[in-house]
Amino acid sequence: MSDCETERQRIRQERWRDVILDRIGRDPWVTVYYSERTEFETVCFFSALIPNVKVPEVLGSSSWDLTIGEGVPGTITFYSGGEAETKYYRFGKDDGIEPLIIYRDFHGVMPSYVEISEEFRLFHNLFHDSKSNRYLGMDENGDSEEIALLDGESVKIKLNQIRSFLSRKEMHLAVFFDIREASRHTLEELGVQETSEQSRQDNLACELCIRKGDLEPGVQTISRLVGKKLIAGPPVQETGGFFSEKNQEFASFVIGVDQAGNEVAHTCNPKELANYFGANPTAPHCLTPVFFRREVLTKYYANPKRFSVEDGYLRCRGVWGLRMDNNHAKYVVVFLGDLGADLSYKEQLYWRSYNIRPEGGISAVCFRRSFLGEFADADRTDLVFKSVLSTFNRDWSAVYGWPLFKPLSDADSHCLVALHIPLTEDEAEFDSQVLALAKILIESLNEGKLRDAVPELDPNTKGISKLERFLQVKGLTDCQAHIKFMRNLHDLRHGAGHRKGEAFQRAAAEFGLGDKNAGAVFDAILRKAVDLLRYLNCRLLGVGSAEPAQT
């Protein structure tokens, strides 16, 4: 393509017309503000919210209905019968048109910038990530999503979020454009004529003007494309916001087998399940247990800042929560109705990928809690350890005035939150849990207070030895098994974080690491940790029994 042909297309604004006609309102992102100026091109986009009732009037002209800098609070003074009346308007005038983008100008004293309407940000509860200058929304699953991007002289917003906002406000979005092109070529050289073309469509009003350029040196031809394109919101019932109910999908889960041995599945939609109030009597009950491989919890343990796997409950911050039976010896079990009531469809599909045929019943702990209405302590070792540790720390501090195990820092808090019996035979998972437990029990020992409690202690004595000496001073002569456990855990932890040497091999042999699977080994380690805490509880605090946990 020749330079002259390229210039002809540019002056006729063919590329920009294609963008306006084919992409605005169809692309997933809408440019609601943009400003750029080069030697031969000036491009400006802006936007405003137009009441639905004003759409015919607005489309009657290609001029902008709100200019950059307008849409801020102001007053208008009216005169009637010689009397002046001043009224305040939130957006500066009384025509019902509102800004989506507000241009903040400080007359050169401070840098100007643009911001998105506060109402829009609050409507979608957007979080401003100041580092990347973007706004994030959160879906029903707790996943974050980019909603708006601000980059210098450009603002883009997700189309679907704009449209749901428009639907609720009963407004249209007007995307204004003003694009000016200049060329050194004459009209004759370009093969174009002076023109003023107006275009009107159901959602578009624009005008293209081409004429001689006689105002700037070296510019022979100029063109200007100015106008607006309107974007409507969907019908209110399709938005799923506020008071309308979304058409939520529900996954089906395996709940049993038929006489031929084939799997039987059923939807988890609570409205299609039986309950104790007589609903759907021929359907499976909402309390039908659904079984899952324990690996279903992997992604939740892997992100402790967002998820918390608790005794009988899975929590995604304050977004959602799911009751579950994680005290089961082999599986995770969830009631069918809870899957539909508490999980989004996206999360249901994740759980379904770990769904297996039922095998036996729910745990005794879950049965007592769910059907007998009784308080029941956890019996799965990782859950027991967390409960016992919490109680021990509280009781020890009440007696001695200081914690034996110092609280983990915010940066290390995940060690306790995500502590669990390994779900797989992956060595890295086992090592990470050993590291976490060692950080909780060994690296968190309150060495300063232990040293203060034993004044004659050798200054070179380290953590576990300090605890050993403290216990001896307290008259405990039967603590060697627990001290040995802590030393073995220390050696195992050293091998998990460094090259695995002789000390690690001895500790691994002590814990039976070569003879049993990783889950069984770490379960046994946690039992010894629970025994240690109960021993200290009984001998130094006078609480409970020091009898070892049953294996």
Where are the regions that the model predicts?
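Amphipathic alpha-helical interface elements
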Residues: 1-323, 337-484, 488, 521, ...
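Amphipathic, charged alpha-helical scaffolds that flank and support histidine-based chemistry
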Residues: 514-522
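Short alpha-helical linear motifs
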Residues: 507-512, 533-534
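Histidine-centered, metal-coordinating catalytic motifs and their short helical/loop contexts
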Residues: 480-509
